[in-house]
């Protein structure tokens, strides 16, 4: 019995390790996408380039994104219109950088574990 439990514990630890590695990879992908969004100017009504980025990001990961003008959306795997639906909604445009901004607003920078750049803690982070 002890050897079975050890095998189960070992398999559970391996499975958890794989989940953590997958989560780490997803976090890295999300941060990289946010960096790309920060580096791409996207003022209101001029966000076609960030819409392109979001559409490509979703498509490269196997989603079937749709787009109307600069609005991008995708349905989760297993979506069933007959079942209750949860809509996650955000925007990907930014305001004009303020004159008092102390950094290059379009140069994503990580310092002390924090990501700086225009839109990094606004809806850009929510989109990602």
What are these language model-derived features?
Residues 119-128:
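Active-site alpha-helical elements of protease catalytic centers
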Residues 17-118:
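Acidic/His- and Gly-rich active-site-bordering loop/insert found
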């Amino acid at each position: 019995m002890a050897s079975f439990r050890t095998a189960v514990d070992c398999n559970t630890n391996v499975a958890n390790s794989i989940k953590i590695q997958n989560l780490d990879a997803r976090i890295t992908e999300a941060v990289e996408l946010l960096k790309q969004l920060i580096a791409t100017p996207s003022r209101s009504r001029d966000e076609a380039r960030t819409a392109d980025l979001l559409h490509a990001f979703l498509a490269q990961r196997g989603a079937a994104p749709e787009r109307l003008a600069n609005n991008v959306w995708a349905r989760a795997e297993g979506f069933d219109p007959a079942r209750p639906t949860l809509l996650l909604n955000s925007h990907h445009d930014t305001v004009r950088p303020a004159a008092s901004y102390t950094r290059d607003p379009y140069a994503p920078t990580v310092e002390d574990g924090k990501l700086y750049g225009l839109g990094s803690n606004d809806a850009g982070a929510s989109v990602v």
